[in-house]
Amino acid sequence: MSIKEQTLMTPYLQFDRNQWAALRDSVPMTLSEDEIARLKGINEDLSLEEVAEIYLPLSRLLNFYISSNLRRQAVLEQFLGTNGQRIPYIISIAGSVAVGKSTTARVLQALLSRWPEHRRVELITTDGFLHPNQVLKERGLMKKKGFPESYDMHRLVKFVSDLKSGVPNVTAPVYSHLIYDVIPDGDKTVVQPDILILEGLNVLQSGMDYPHDPHHVFVSDFVDFSIYVDAPEDLLQTWYINRFLKFREGAFTDPDSYFHNYAKLTKEEAIKTAMTLWKEINWLNLKQNILPTRERASLILTKSANHAVEEVRLRK
């Protein structure tokens, strides 16, 4: 079978960086270099060029999809003779630990909020829907954080279901990476956004991923457009270790940090510890639960060195 025939048979349209960048059209750059610097993650290189060539075309595509969705809602309201409720357009962002999901989410939030048609863009991470540490300890799951069984999926599904049902005020729990736990009584209220960006490891998972907790509705059932941020495993491991080393010199030095003891490690000890955490927890979760969901995404961003996106695949 020829490459051309294989391309025709795939459910995705494939673009290299230059082809994708050309789809920006005339969308203006609405972020300054200072704003971009504030949006990037602790271990990522996010440049003006990256935003212009990757994220502006993506924001343009999403604007088309969102506008189409609003027109469809208007048609339904006309048919029913009703004044419709504000129903948010939900974008999910999945991918491995350390791949840069949070940066992608923050950049898209900033860009989409600047489109005149829809200014209210909320960003929620699924970390808040992890079971509290006390529950995880009781169930012997502290080393399984991020795995399907560590989440309160019923609460997460209810959260997105309520938003899609037009409930005006919906609360989401908030997670603190400092204390490595859900913040008690720290819920965030989400008030009828035009767009919700939902970022997390598990947002593309379905019933096959939860045999231990069978239920019939999943987050992915409520998502309008899903993004998977991808990268080769060797890069993911390197990024994870580098991020751990930066935390060792930064966040871990806070006496209130759950991982304060790691700040006392030598660099060699820290690298060894990070490697162990990667192999025994994060790599395992990637292979078993995250990577298998990649082909369910509407769009796949594949990164190379320095977190630069080199390929984009868009579902037909």
From Swiss-Prot:
Enzyme Commission number, as recorded: 2.7.1.33
CDD domains from the UniProt entry: PanK
Pfam families membership: PRK
GO cellular component entries: cytoplasm
Record InterPro entries: P-loop_NTPase (IPR027417), PanK (IPR004566), PRK/URK (IPR006083)
Subcellular location per the Swiss-Prot or TrEMBL entry: Cytoplasm
Keyword line: ATP-binding, Coenzyme A biosynthesis, Cytoplasm, Kinase, Nucleotide-binding, Transferase
Regulation: Regulated by feedback inhibition by CoA and its thioesters.
Known catalytic reactions: (R)-pantothenate + ATP = (R)-4'-phosphopantothenate + ADP + H(+)
Pathway: Cofactor biosynthesis; coenzyme A biosynthesis; CoA from (R)-pantothenate: step 1/5
Binding site for ATP: 95-102
HAMAP family registered for this protein in UniProt: Pantothen_kinase_1
Family from the record: Belongs to the prokaryotic pantothenate kinase family.
NCBIfam families per UniProt: panK_bact
Stated name of the protein: Pantothenate kinase
Organism: Escherichia coli (strain K12)
Lineage of the species this protein comes from: Bacteria, Pseudomonadati, Pseudomonadota, Gammaproteobacteria, Enterobacterales
Underlying gene: coaA
